[in-house]
């Protein structure tokens, strides 16, 4: 089964103090009109697909109510009308509550999923590369990147999604050197286009399949296998 990275963010100041690999995280929040606004992250409600500049967050309200798009930044499992927010010390991610608030693999995505999930703009794409964002000279997985959840591995260092070397040919070597089962090292998973590193807090929420533990704390999970790149990054269907 394929899933997509929809969004990635962290609001933990402790993570910013970590110098390891100079981890730079995408800071995105789907906020209500009454949520906090600041000079660097203004929230604009858009009913159309518009580009934003700098780090402004755009809320797309088509087929969604603002009140249902709240992100509750708590270190616990919390729910709003349409979303379940899973938080850890370092990362927060969201899945549609209809896709299972209990976070089990078999019920994560099914026919009851919301068919229109709208996402925020992160930053301008790196050059004309459709697969990555360039944020402070670091490449990040594109919103909407598809990966196989069964090949997703985890560790306990806190979210750091950056490109290893972008070379599919080197994947096996990179993977064989980093695959562990003890949560102590950075592990890799294979996306549909390239190799990305994901490190995840040990306090994350997990789901299980065939006695294997997988974490949902690093990514927004979508039930959809296709998206419209012309509308990207605002909409995933």
From Swiss-Prot:
This is Putative uncharacterized protein DDB_G0268338. Residues 30-80 have a biased composition (Low complexity). Residues 29-80 are annotated as: Disordered.
């Amino acid at each position: 089964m394929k899933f997509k990275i929809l969004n990635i963010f962290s609001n933990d100041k402790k993570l910013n103090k970590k110098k390891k690999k100079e981890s730079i995280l995408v800071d995105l929040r789907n906020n209500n009109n009454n949520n906090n606004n600041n000079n660097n992250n203004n929230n604009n409600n858009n009913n159309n697909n518009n580009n934003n500049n700098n780090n402004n967050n755009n809320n797309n309200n088509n087929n969604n109510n603002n009140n249902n798009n709240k992100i509750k930044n708590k270190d616990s499992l919390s729910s709003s009308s349409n979303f379940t927010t899973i938080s850890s010390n370092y990362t927060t991610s969201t899945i549609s509550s209809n896709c299972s608030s209990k976070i089990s693999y078999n019920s994560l995505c099914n026919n009851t999923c919301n068919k229109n999930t709208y996402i925020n703009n992160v930053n301008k794409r790196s050059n004309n590369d459709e697969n990555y964002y360039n944020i402070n000279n670091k490449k990040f997985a594109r919103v909407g990147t598809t990966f196989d959840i069964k090949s997703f591995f985890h560790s306990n260092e806190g979210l750091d999604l950056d490109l290893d070397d972008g070379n599919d040919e080197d994947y096996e070597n990179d993977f064989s050197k980093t695959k562990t089962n003890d949560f102590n090292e950075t592990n890799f998973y294979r996306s549909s286009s390239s190799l990305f590193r994901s490190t995840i807090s040990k306090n994350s929420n997990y789901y299980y399949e065939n006695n294997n533990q997988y974490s949902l704390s690093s990514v927004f999970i979508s039930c959809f296998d296709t998206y419209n790149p012309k509308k990207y990054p605002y909409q995933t269907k």
